[in-house]
Amino acid sequence: DSPIKAAVDNGDELSSKLIFDAAKEGDFFAPYADMLKAGYGTLAYGDAWNIFDNIVVSENLAKGSTGKLKLQQAPGSKFYGNIFKQLYMVQKEGQYKGYPLRTYVGNNFQGGYSDHFPVYIYIGK
């Protein structure tokens, strides 16, 4: 029985019924739920942040026993989910200052990376 049940970049909001129901049933744990409640996000739209990318893990991985693989908090963080957000990935000026620096806006090349920041987790013993 593998401790990792699902790891996805499903391009779906954390609040979506699919993710919410899976986490609610107790088989899965959505480590980004607390981050969203605290105002963090991977994608900004209409001056509101949302968690658009998710890594969903099994409850076994989230609550692993001593000596087993277990979901870990990042050093210095109170969250189990992490958002990779570096200065070079952030729009530095204009209306979308602080948003992810996009590759394209419409048909115009911006030279950025994506319209959302990537996510990652730590797994250890």
Question: Which role does the model predict for each range below?
Answer:
Residues 1-125:
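Metal-dependent phosphoester-hydrolase catalytic domains
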